[in-house]
Amino acid sequence: MSVHITKTYNIGGLIGLRQNAVKNAGETLGFKEMSLFKFPDAYDSDDELHVRMDGIIASLCPEDIVIFQHPSGESPRYDGFLFEHLRRYHGTKIVAFIQEIASDRDDSEYSLRDEITLLNRADMFIFASAALRDYYIANGLKEKPYLIQNIPDYMTDICANEHKNKKLYIMAETSQNEYPLNNLNIEVVQYDAVSYTHLT
């Protein structure tokens, strides 16, 4: 069983940056990229779009998991065709990673009804916030297993090993001797209740 994660090419802005960051994080966990391409699919016949989808999912095997990043930047028709093809593989699970409300975007072809129809075809959800889940549930999204990804990790190339003035802040009645950090050049700063009020 493999885990695939979608990434749409030929889009920019926040969607493109976010999808790339999530895809990169997924690859560090061994996920495989499932590449989508933004284009005016209205010019493709259904048969032509089916051929494109066959190429997109060529590496998919039965029982695989696909994490679909929503919004994808594609049209409802394109995404619907993708879900249809994913469902052709026995046991394939679709996890919809819902990062924002597509129908609220000025550049989106989606209506809220389109979103609910598509997302209800997924097996599981990952939401960027609990409020996002509440909104979709209130508007017709089915109750299914889900995760809330409250605080994402952001990939960075910045080395954090050489910070100066390292400090460990504690709020407890304790002795600095209990923290043998002097040999690591880390200062222990203790806050009592009075000191803490100055921080808030």
Please report, for each region that a protein language model flagged, where it lies by residue:
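N-terminal pre-catalytic "stem/leader" segment of glycosyltransferase-like enzymes
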Residues: 1-75
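Short, solvent-exposed loop/turn segments at secondary-structure junctions
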Residues: 8-11, 40-41, 71-74, 100-103, ...
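A generic structural motif
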Residues: 29-35, 91, 186-189
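Extended catalytic core of nucleotide-activated donor transferases of GT-like folds
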Residues: 44-121, 127-131
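Short active-site oxyanion
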Residues: 121-125, 166-169
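Donor nucleotide-sugar binding/catalytic pocket of nucleotide-sugar-dependent glycosyltransferases
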Residues: 123-137, 141-159
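Conserved donor-binding/catalytic core segment of Leloir-type glycosyltransferases
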Residues: 160-190
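Conserved small/polar residues in nucleotide/adenosyl-binding loops
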Residues: 197-200
